[in-house]
Amino acid sequence: MNKMNRLSHNTEIRNAIYSGVGIGISGNSFLLLFHIFKYIRGQRSRHIDLPIGLLSLIHLVMLIAMSLVATDIFMPWGRWGDTTCKCVISLYRFCRSLSLCATSLLSILQAVTLNPRNSCLEKFKRKSPHYMLGCLLFLSVFYTFISSPLATYITAKSNLTSPSFTYITTSCSLAPMSYSFHLTVFILLTSRDVIFVGLMLLSSGYMVTFLGRHKKQSQFLHITSFSLKPSAEKRAMRTILCLMSFFVLMYTLDSIVSYIRSIDDGQIFYCVHIFTAHGYATVSPFLILSTEKYIINIFRSTFGRMVTIILLRNR
């Protein structure tokens, strides 16, 4: 039996992956429904609400595709055909690409919203969510153009005739590529990652610098009108640092594991790669929800009522 096929009998890894995917789907579903509920109720929306809603939708679709991949790895019900392999694997890769783009654009948008109202970016600030939609649409078309040739190398195992095929799932594998094509895809995807991660780091650094400078100015001037702002600034800084830092951490780990897999494509590194690939999509909604005052107040109110009911029953 092939060592990769033994994954289907490893219940500990299977349960861990399914638990992580299930938690991520629940968190992103709740975050998406929360923003839909805010829109239906007509509550005042922030500039980042639409991008966060889009990011949660992207992660939701990505984790659903991941659950299908995990099912074919651990509990295959039947062999997938070429079309199913191409669609599921390509959808997962497409959502991962959009997650990177949306996170980078979200960090840029948050940096823009910190500028004062009389700045030159005020006009852009009002239309920035719509610009982000346009950027995501353009990037979607661009990535589809890049990844379409790559999808032709994803094939069902029933068609395999060479041991040089790379394992993806029980049903699917990646056919060997020519050196020139592999190098072209590598350069394009690496350039994309460097650009968007670089923009993310620059915008996050700008936000931290801006918030720190604003806090020092308010403390130096002792202006009472700023007395309510430090907590909001700290909360915004904490959200930015946590979300972007966690993304960079998971991206770095995923890149390291991907490189190791290119040398040793064993069972252990394959499983670690699964966790690092969807770790950000699983944790990010909870990082965002932890800073939503409205949700925190609901949980506090609900928890307080539950405690009161329990105390009354015990009397």
UniProtKB/Swiss-Prot annotation:
GO terms for biological process: response to pheromone; sensory perception of chemical stimulus. It is a multi-pass membrane protein. GO terms for molecular function: pheromone receptor activity. One of its GO terms (cellular component) is plasma membrane. Its main location: membrane. Belongs to the G-protein coupled receptor 1 family. Residues 41-51, 113-132, 213-239, 289-315 are cytoplasmic. It comes from the Eukaryota. Disulfide bonds join C85-C172. The chain crosses the membrane at residues 16-40, 52-71, 91-112, 133-154, 194-212, 240-260, 268-288. CDD domains: 7tm_V1R_pheromone (cd13949). This is Vomeronasal type-1 receptor 54. Putative pheromone receptor implicated in the regulation of social and reproductive behavior. Disruption phenotype: Mice lacking all but one V1ra and V1rb gene (12% of the V1r repertoire) show a lack of chemosensory response to a subset of known pheromonal ligands and changes in maternal aggression as well as male reproductive behavior. Residues 1-15, 72-90, 155-193, 261-267 are extracellular. It is found in: Cell membrane. Keywords: Cell membrane, Disulfide bond, G-protein coupled receptor, Membrane, Pheromone response, Receptor, Transducer, Transmembrane, Transmembrane helix. The gene is Vmn1r54. The lineage of its organism: Eukaryota, Metazoa, Chordata, Craniata, Vertebrata.
